[in-house]
Amino acid sequence: MAKGGVKKAAAAAARAAANRLMADNRQARHQYEILETLETGIELVGTEVKSIRNGKANLRDGFCLIRNGELQLHNVHISPHSHASAYFNHDPLRTRKLLAHRREIDKLRGQLDKKGLALIPLNIHLKGSWIKITIGVGKGRKLHDKRAADKEKQSKKEVRSAMAKYQ
């Protein structure tokens, strides 16, 4: 009986390790109101994979464009791998191709035709052994929208702490 519990716990730990977050763009959720998200694959070279698995990716200034019917990721910094020579290492800010179905790209193109919408990378994560990136269609927030969102977030936090205090 105890062995079954150990096996289940080990399987749950393996699933959690197989779906872990590698990089997160927390600033994007502050600067943009995310309307829709999409999980895509990303075309990488070997040293980029090693750097991402070591947690050396920065999504903060990144954005996505649709060019020639392809999704492209721009301005995302993936540090060069520390144990690779300069000859084999990659360019940290190179443009990377995102892998999505044609109908998903067409749907995104239709949404981006609306004024004020942008494609923003939200996070890089593992799904099994594959590296995936979640992108979001976002509408830029004005300063007063950011302040209102911060005020609402603060009030929810205070309510939660008050509820926890009296329970």
Swiss-Prot record:
SUPFAM superfamilies: Small protein B (SmpB) (SSF74982)
CDD domains tied to this protein: SmpB
Highest taxon of the lineage: Bacteria
One Pfam family of this chain: SmpB
Main localization category: cytoplasm
Any Gene Ontology biological process: trans-translation
Example GO molecular function: RNA binding
Keyword set, alphabetical order: Cytoplasm, RNA-binding
Location in or out of the cell: Cytoplasm
Region named Disordered: 144-167
Similarity-based family: Belongs to the SmpB family.
Any GO CC annotation of this UniProt entry: cytosol
PANTHER family named in the record: SSRA-BINDING PROTEIN (PTHR30308:SF2), TMRNA-BINDING COMPONENT OF TRANS-TRANSLATION TAGGING COMPLEX (PTHR30308)
Protein name as annotated: SsrA-binding protein
Protein source organism: Synechococcus sp. (strain CC9902)
Summary of the function given for this chain in its UniProt record: Required for rescue of stalled ribosomes mediated by trans-translation. Binds to transfer-messenger RNA (tmRNA), required for stable association of tmRNA with ribosomes. tmRNA and SmpB together mimic tRNA shape, replacing the anticodon stem-loop with SmpB. tmRNA is encoded by the ssrA gene; the 2 termini fold to resemble tRNA(Ala) and it encodes a 'tag peptide', a short internal open reading frame. During trans-translation Ala-aminoacylated tmRNA acts like a tRNA, entering the A-site of stalled ribosomes, displacing the stalled mRNA.
InterPro entries: SmpB, SsrA-bd_prot, SsrA-bd_prot_CS
Segments of skewed composition (Basic and acidic residues): 146-160
